[in-house]
Amino acid sequence: MIETAVKTLKEIAAAIPDTSPGMERQMLIGDLVAKQSPAERTALRKLMDSYLLRMSNVNASDIDMGGYGSGGNIWYRIFGDKKPQVDLGKFTMDEFNVLIQSIMIERQRLFLYENRNMVSSTRWCARTRALTCMPT
């Protein structure tokens, strides 16, 4: 399942032309995400859920993905010590952007495009095993 989701993520990101800059690039990513099949969206959501479940299992207080300093890794802060999780693989900025936008609803993507950022409160609900991201 994870391998399939990562493959889907890489295929979608590969469709993003190098010539698209800044917010135009984010909007193009949003268009690609909107065209995903329900199966692809489900696979990407489960991939993100796996990262969040791991976060919970290792008692991490936060997760960091996609910053320029990330080196393409997903980072967890565990008891105040922030480290890359190299065993989760390497991702490009576009791959992180596709993954993050794939869990956002359309209104959140519109908020991102209009405000050029997405300050969010993200909660992992153990009861429903779902990620909730809401603009703040």
Language model feature labels by segment:
Residues 3, 17-136:
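N-terminal "pre-motor" subdomain/linker immediately upstream of P-loop NTPase catalytic cores
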Residues 2-11:
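Intrinsic-disorder signal
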